[in-house]
Amino acid sequence: MGFPRILSKNNKIYTKLGEFCLSGDSFWIVCHTCQEELQTQDQFWKHIQDEHNFLHGVAKEHSRTSSYCLTDVEAAAATSGATTSQGAGSVTSVTVPLALYHCSTKYSEDDQREMDIHEAQQQQHQQQHQQQQQLQQQQQRDVAKELAELHANAVAVASAAAAAANESSTRSSSGIDIKIEPPCLTLPPEMQAAAAASNATIYHLPQLGPAAVPPPPPTTGFVSANVSTSTTVSTTPPNVTGSHSVMQQQAGVLTGSGLSTLSMSVGPSTAMAAALLSTQELPKDSNSTTASAGSAVSSDDGERWYICDYETCGLKFKYKSRMELHRVVHSKERRFNCELCSASFKQSCNLSTHRKKKHALRGIKSEILPQRF
């Protein structure tokens, strides 16, 4: 019974189950499964049948765990051949002892260790790669989140700025301050003498130019206020009893061309319209707005009241200072002037608000004093 054999370049014959090792005239067979050395092919065949249950080409799977070097076998054979040649020269055939090679598992253990180390390195490399990918993904998410927050903050700041601008524009457009810049004016000597005699404050009025004497006023009078909104108010005053001279004087005052032009940001308020319309009511002896001592009247219950004697106003005040503030409505006087832009105001609070908005001045309200002449 034969075996399929392949002769290699290094004088080794390999089969599927064993290795044929040649040395001179002798050879031996090494079992690949258990590394046992056998002398003949019959012994090898019987060995693989009995020990490894090999039946007609069906064998168990095995792995080669060791390698044999032919140089060691040849060195051992050469040593034994030299020894026998020095003996009897008549001997033609010499039996060469078999080189006994015992398989050790060191080579297989080293291979297994190297494979384990290689697998561990691969696993570690894969873990590091996964960690790097996770870190990059987390960084990308953080960057996207920061960009979203920055965008939201920018939108909020822009909306707040737009709201502030709208609010400031609304406030500036809804202001009801009336600015008048009259020239330097003085009161007539008669009014100054009367004010000095009554120890009252002299308020300078707008310059009243010489008025032409109009014809007698009709029953229905029309008063036109020269304002920025060009509002014309008509009224029907009651029958006026008095001399023609007084009526003509009042009409001249109303229609005189020397009145200063009012610059208003909005239409005239109800109080201003009432003040303009009241100029054709029953006349008084004087157009001066100086509060006099004779305007105080005692009521039935003994309380003292100060009554506004400007034409037909007749409003009552408990304190004289309140009445003086009220008379400013009739006189159109502006005692509080802005030292930066020459704007004038009736009340100090309006001047304070103007200085805060227009000139960004704060904390100097105590320095605002009415202008005295």
From Swiss-Prot:
InterPro entries: Znf_C2H2_sf (IPR036236), Znf_C2H2_type (IPR013087)
Function per UniProt: May be a transcription factor for genes having (A+T) stretches in their promoter and/or enhancer regions. Binds to AT rich DNA.
Stretches annotated zinc finger (C2H2-type): 29-52, 306-330, 336-359
The protein's name: AT-rich binding protein
Residue ranges, annotated region (Disordered): 110-144
Molecular-function annotations in GO: DNA-binding transcription activator activity, RNA polymerase II-specific; RNA polymerase II cis-regulatory region sequence-specific DNA binding; zinc ion binding
GO CC terms: nucleus
Keywords: DNA-binding, Metal-binding, Nucleus, Repeat, Transcription, Transcription regulation, Zinc, Zinc-finger
GO biological process terms on file: regulation of transcription by RNA polymerase II
Transcription regulation listed as a keyword: yes
UniProt feature, compositional bias: Basic and acidic residues: 110-119
Predominant location category: nucleus
Localization per Swiss-Prot or TrEMBL: Nucleus
Compositional bias per record (Low complexity), positions renumbered to this chain: 121-140
UniProt-listed PROSITE patterns: ZINC_FINGER_C2H2_1 (PS00028), ZINC_FINGER_C2H2_2 (PS50157)
